[in-house]
Amino acid sequence: ITSSSGNWSYAGGGTKYAAALLSTWCGPVKSDKAYNVNGWSNAAYKLESAISVDGKNLNKDAAAREKMKRAIVKYGAVTFSYNNVREAYYYNPSEESGSSPHACTIIGWDDTIPAENFYPSKTTTDGGWLVKNSYSSLPYFYLSYEVTCEQIYAFDYVMNDKYDNNYFYDASATDSGIGSLLKIKQAANVFKVKGDTENEWIKAVGVGIVGENTDCTVEVYSDVQDGSFNPQNAKLETTKTVYLEYGGFNCIELDKPVEVKKGSTFAVVVKVNNAYITLSENEGESYVYRGGWTPSQAVRIKVFTKNDEKNQNSIEFMDEGQVKVRGNGGIKQLIITMSENEELKDFYVESINFDENKEKIVTLPSGWIRIENIRYKAFLWDNFENISPECSEIEW
């Protein structure tokens, strides 16, 4: 079952289906839970991204393999499927017949394995992927670089308390064929704030795309009129442009959360230039731009929000070397690190009492100015013992 006409959450057979389901925050569920528990209410974590690596040239293109390696380093592992016939520690099944798809996880690689080590098909390329298998009889093995890999995904999760709500319309495991036919580069979803008792804060936007190496622009609008969408009739709250190296489902965190009022209607527009936005097979208040905004099948655009942040902890980098910190009470430690190429260069610590004032502007020492290729991370800790639920990590 892969569409909204049945229970599509039972869809199986590939990591692409898993990515679509996990992006709705159904699962993952810890192994000590019963197999039939509700995946949404028992999710151990929330998925932010499920990026897709193009595997069609991995068996013949060194540059494609380097891109795969970067994904493994960034996300820790990638899932994939290949045609499997037998078990072998150095395996190359590329010329075997009677094989069937088998899903595994790649956790590393070794470029120095001699080609002649791989069995049974002949191999001319040295090196292979280190695979974590699901078979206890062969828990780990090396798969030749010359093997064709499919449905390659890396999943990135966050703690459950980072977001409270996930707004979306797409509810199918498979993409709509119309999306691939039209190759939509601009799309929008319009949502009404779910809660009627408190405001919410939009913190991130997720989008499903086919393609890679693309610029992606996200725009958030408030004061949207019910029943239609036209950016000219709404208020632009924020915009952010990022570069996406991989396809699949990417999460774009906003530089500053956008407050949306209870009961109000908001919209999110996504634009890409070297890819296209995917659609699902069901309906929603979605729009695509083709010379004008027209209603469409549900686009795979999701919005992650946090309930009213007035009582939450948050950190915001400002200009002129300042940081705005909001706390929900008590004494907390603000820690800011400066790094270059993942190497720690400097750090700053300040103790802040939020009992008297819930918000404070912290001015950093001289030298803490915007520098190209320098990454800043900010954390809010409770007395160095427990990390705050709203720990922020923001590029500045």
Per-range role (PLM):
Residues T217-Y221, Q333-M338, K377-F379:
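Beta-strand signatures of extracellular beta-sandwich domains
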Residues I1-G128, K132-E212, Y243-G247, K261-G263:
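Predominantly the structural core of cysteine protease catalytic domains
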Residues F266-V270, R370-E385:
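Short, aromatic- and glycine-rich surface loops/edge beta-strands on solvent-exposed regions
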Residues S280-Q312:
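PGST-rich, cysteine-poor low-complexity/disordered linker and tail segments that act as flexible spacers
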Residues G248-N250, K358-V362:
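Short strand-edge motifs at loop-to-beta-strand transitions and within beta-strands
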Residues N213-S286:
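Aromatic- and Gly/Pro-enriched, solvent-exposed loop/edge beta-strand patches characteristic
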Residues W201-K203, D319-V323:
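Structural beta-strand segments of beta-rich domains
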Residues V272-L279, D382-C391:
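Short acidic/polar inter-strand loop motif in beta-rich domains
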